[in-house]
Structure formats: C-alpha cells, structure tokens
C-alpha cells in the first residue's frame, strides 16, 4: 500500500502533465488570435510602405505611417494579456482547490487541512519575480506589459532596415511575416509566437507553483518542507538537475520554474505520523516516474544520469562538465551555486583546480 508521501509524489508528476496540456490549450487560443491580427498587420505594413518613397524616408515619417500598425499590435496584445490574466486567475482557483482536495483525500481524517485565499494568491503570483534570464527577474504583470512593446520595436526596426537597404515592399513584409511555403516559420512574427508560447507555459508553471507554495505555508504544521522535482530526461537543464530531489523549508529554496519552458515542479513532504501526533506507521520512501519507468523518489538526477551513455551525459552537461562528471564522480549539483545558478567553466576551474588537473582539462 502506498504511503502519503508516495501518493503525493505520484500526483505531483501526473498533475504537472495535466498543467502542460492546459498551457498548450491556452497557447493554441492565443496563437489563433495573433494569426488573425498578423493578416491585418501585413496589409497595414504594405500600405504604409507604399506611402513611404525611399527618397522621402525619415524616422519621424516612418513612425507616423506605422501608427495603425502599432495600434493593431497594441490591441492584439491587450487581448492576449486579458486572456492570460483571466486564465491565470482561474488557474489559481483550480490549483488551490486541487491541492486542498488532494490533501483531504490523502491524509487521515484526523488531520485538519487549511485553504488559501485565492485573491491573495493571485496577487502574489502577479507580483512575484517571474522571468528568469540573463537580465534578471521581473514580476509577471510587468513581463506581460513588455511583450507588446518588444514586438512593436522588432517590426519597426525590420521596416527601417529594409527601407534603408532599398528593399522592395514584398521582401520587407516577408521578413516580418515569413513565407507561405515555409508555413511562415521564417518570419519575425514566428519568433514572437515562440516567445509567447514559452511565456505562457512558464506563466502557468509559475502561477501553479505560487499557489502550491502558499498552500504549503498555510499547512506548515503538517509539512517537513517541500521537494524540488525535475523531469528525468535528456532535455533537463543543469540548473533543474542539480536541484532535483532536494528538500527545502517551507517559504525558502529555489522554486520552479527556474527558466523559460521549465518543466520542474514541487511536491510537499509530510511530517511523520509521530510528529503529527497520529498513531500510524511512518511514511516510507516513495517512487516517481522517469522516461525509463518507475524510479525511487530519493534517486537524484546524478544517479539517474550515471546510468546513461557518455553522449547523453555530454548532451545535458556539455563535454567538459561531462568529462568531470564521469572521471571524477562529481555530482550534478556541484556544477551550480547554492541558488541553483550554473557556474561557468572558469568558476568551476577555480573551485576545483585539482579535479580539472586530474581530468586533463
């Protein structure tokens, strides 16, 4: 018979798959909206360029002619933002209810489970730093505002470059919109669509995690902490691999998502029955899924990766880190700092000079 922590670990993995399917459905609706807008943008860009002879080109003139383009783009992204905000608000309500019902159905009836304030959690999700990149992190609401301005600037710059280079109108439009023969995958708009896809997936993961962490905090008396759970496959980032399986106190630790399109999640770690004052057998070690089937829940990413080929190890870690991993038995978590940030090779070399020397690197 499964223990509570075992059941919760299984549920966390299954639930993350459901959230991925949900985010994909939101993405499809957003892309359909943007595709409809892109047709209008193509017509407006063509009309603007036809009214802008190369000999009369000025930045001010271009900006004036692109007013309708900017307006159409702004309206489209207002609709995108509204759709995302509505979906995320509904997601908070769903996730809060899901976690509450999961605990209610999994824990003994003697245990009292607390619910979260959905409005407060949604506000926290919008305000919590979200975009993890070389530029740092910003709150989700600020991230959403920046999407529209970013695409508008790319459109303007592409047109400006084309006019300065003396390119014909159809070539400029193709650069922005893409070509039909390639299903428009070669245009700037496709880049924007991919950006939106990554943002939506990460926003869903971010919002679900904020809801979970707030739920954990409300039920802190029941929990030892929370566990970082990364997907065990060759696409997992070094950052997530280094954190997988680690347990952190409630309210602290590096939380998922760690990067755009992050697939990591979290699971609560219930206190022992003795600590909860309940006379039941202690929880045992659980199991969770990898692409290879069932693996122990206490199996770290390093243990999983050591069973893979050198090519898989190098694909995930890079050639230098892969060699260190194999020859010196360095665990994956040694390639990151305490916050899960990947150390550069120079930083690793300074920190592990002797190991680099032994490996002949």
Predicted segments, located by residue:
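Acidic, glycine-rich two-metal-ion catalytic cores of nucleic acid-processing enzymes
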Residues: 173, 183-284
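N-terminal leader/targeting and assembly helices and adjacent pre-domain segments
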Residues: 1-183, 275-361
């Amino acid at each position: 018979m499964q223990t509570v922590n075992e059941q919760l670990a299984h549920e966390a993995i299954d639930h993350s798959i459901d959230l991925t399917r949900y985010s994909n459905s939101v993405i499809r609706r957003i892309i359909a909206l943007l595709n409809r807008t892109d047709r209008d943008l193509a017509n407006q860009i063509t009309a603007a360029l036809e009214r802008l002879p190369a000999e009369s080109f000025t930045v001010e003139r271009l900006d004036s002619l692109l007013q309708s383009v900017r307006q159409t783009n702004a309206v489209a992204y207002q609709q995108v933002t509204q759709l995302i905000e509505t979906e995320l608000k509904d997601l908070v309500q769903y996730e809060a209810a899901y976690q509450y019902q999961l605990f209610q159905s999994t824990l003994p009836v003697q245990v009292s489970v607390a619910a979260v304030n959905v409005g407060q959690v949604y506000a926290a999700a919008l305000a919590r730093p979200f975009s993890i990149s070389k530029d740092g992190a910003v709150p989700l609401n600020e991230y959403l505002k920046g999407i529209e301005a970013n695409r508008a600037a790319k459109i303007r710059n592409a047109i400006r470059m084309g006019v300065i280079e003396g390119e014909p109108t159809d070539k400029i439009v193709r650069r922005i919109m893409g070509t039909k023969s390639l299903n428009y995958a070669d245009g700037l708009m496709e880049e924007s669509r991919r950006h939106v896809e990554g943002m939506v997936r990460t926003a869903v993961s971010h919002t679900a995690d904020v809801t979970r962490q707030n739920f954990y905090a409300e039920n802190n008396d029941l929990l030892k902490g929370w566990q970082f759970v990364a997907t065990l496959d060759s696409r997992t980032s070094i950052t997530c691999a280094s954190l997988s399986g680690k347990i952190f106190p409630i309210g602290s630790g590096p939380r998922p998502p760690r990067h755009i399109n992050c697939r990591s999640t979290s699971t609560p770690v219930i206190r022992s029955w003795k600590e909860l004052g309940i006379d039941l057998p202690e929880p045992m070690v659980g199991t969770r899924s990898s692409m290879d089937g069932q693996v122990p829940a206490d199996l770290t990413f390093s243990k999983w990766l050591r069973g893979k080929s050198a090519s898989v190890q190098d694909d995930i870690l890079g050639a230098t880190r892969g060699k260190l991993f194999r020859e010196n038995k360095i665990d994956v978590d040694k390639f990151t700092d305490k916050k899960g940030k990947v150390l550069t090779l120079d930083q690793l070399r300074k920190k592990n000079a002797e190991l680099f020397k032994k490996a002949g690197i």
